[in-house]
Amino acid sequence: QCKGRPVPQLEDVTEKAGIRFRHIANPLSTYIVESMSGGVILWDYDRDGWLDIYFTNAPTIEMALRKESARGALYHNNHNGTFSDATDKSGLATPCFAMGGAVADYNNDGWPDLYLTCLGGNILFRNNGDGTFTDVTAKADVADGRMSVGAAFGDYDRDGFVDLMVANYVDFQLDHLPPFGGKSLCKYRGIDVYCGPRGLRGAGDSLFHNNGDSTFTDVSKAAGVDDPHGYFGLGVVWADFNNTGWPDIYVANDTLPNFLYRNDGKGKFTEIGLESGTALSETGSEQASMGVALGDYLHNGRPSIYVTNFSDDYSDLYRNDGNWMFSDVSYASGVALPSFPLVKWGDAFVDLDNDGWLDLVAVSGHVYPQMEKVPASAGYAQPKLLHLNQKDGTFCDAGNLAGPALEEKRVSRGLAVGD
């Protein structure tokens, strides 16, 4: 634990801020897709200098079979600590079976646009600059159509237009639903739970090249990032990991090795996850890889990688040592043990105490509601994690020292940080 240093105090101001959004969830989590949604995005969609909020939402499978949708929510920042619901005006109310999303100005008109990852077809919303958005998915040709979870924009060919990388999870069809429980891969600690991802077919990933005319071309296979074996992709980030001037790609895969794609500067990527030390744990184990964040926590000019994982496993901190080499310093840095009992999801590097050094925060929540019946488990709702940077390559655990907001147990998925 952190001792002899001030710890930032975090307060839950949701009610004071006027945020009334509630995420829909099946209390039984009968299918794997019902445990996945819950993304959140901080972005200044109207360019007034204040961060606004978008929450993704998804229906239960029972609702989806009845063609019912779930209402997402856009909250406009009022500049006084409160927010106003701008969902109806914006046109972002009920877009899809939404998981997460990404923001970028894809058409270089100066306004940030919104891309949502969904089950059965993603959506690209063009920002019209007047508080409204237009669905341009068909024109842009970026629907994908599989179960997408993670997405990120990056200009891999440095032509001045952002491209789009999408991580896809499992092949999940509403007209061919997997059973609940029964099989060995559909049990956890002897209890029947939903099936997956093991036992289900994975889905490949997509890289869409921005053509500069508001359309995209799928170059996944040509670029070497299509994941032909169909791993269970969850998160994706872009970064110039070796300071070559070209953005590389990291994909976090559930229960399978992660990918690190090195950009060769000629439109192609080489997968070097195993060689770089970022594919597996320190002991060579495949992990759940449920959240991924980047940050130069050492001030060495190189982005390191933080990956959150399932319970009874630790979160990985891959220290970037340069020359495409990373070291798993999770235990040495102090971030491993506090994370072990929790099912970790969204994570971020953020300087919470304004000391100039990046700290680590992560949210947690089990995927199986049935865990409430297991006395030895951490339960379904779980607390958050906070690791403060000690400026020497290590972190101290401040999760239970930063106020009740972090200690309060919730079933969390997405995380976004901002002022």
Model-assigned labels for residue ranges:
Residues Q1-D419:
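Acidic, glycine/proline-rich Ca2+-coordinating loop motifs
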